[in-house]
Amino acid sequence: MAKQIRYDHFLHGGDYNPEQWLDRPDILKKDIEYFKKAHINTVSMGMFSWAVLEPEEGRYNFDWLEDVINNLYKEGIYTILSTPSGARPKWMADKYEEVLRVDPDRTRRFFGGRHNHCYTSPVYREKIYNINK
């Protein structure tokens, strides 16, 4: 049974995608300032970060994620970690064409866009399993 956590306040926030600004620590710092001004105490992260979390097949980088989460926590901001399956990395589409979605007219979609994947692809399912471990 899942542990129930009770808070004495509402969790308030939204999606946060800091991976697009990793080369700009000044922006990441400013984000936290803005969050505090808006009384944001919770962010969800990771939903579109797969390409940064696994830049090459089998090579994972979670250091940046840990740093961002720690910096948020120091400022009283909680993190809800999402699965990064919203946008898979380009290397996957290049190497495994079968992970790309096929439309009803049997046209295979090109890489790009969110949720453009074939949910029944065994390769896609394996890669999702691996990144979520």
Regions flagged by a language model, labelled:
Residues 28-109, 129:
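Aromatic-lined substrate-binding rim segments of carbohydrate-active enzymes
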Residues 12-23, 48-64, 110-130:
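The substrate-binding groove and active-site-proximal loops of carbohydrate-active enzymes
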Residues 1-25, 34-41:
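An acidic-aromatic substrate-binding cleft motif
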Residues 1, 10-12, 96-98, 106, ...:
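Generic structural motif recognizing short loop/turn segments at the entrances and edges of beta-strands
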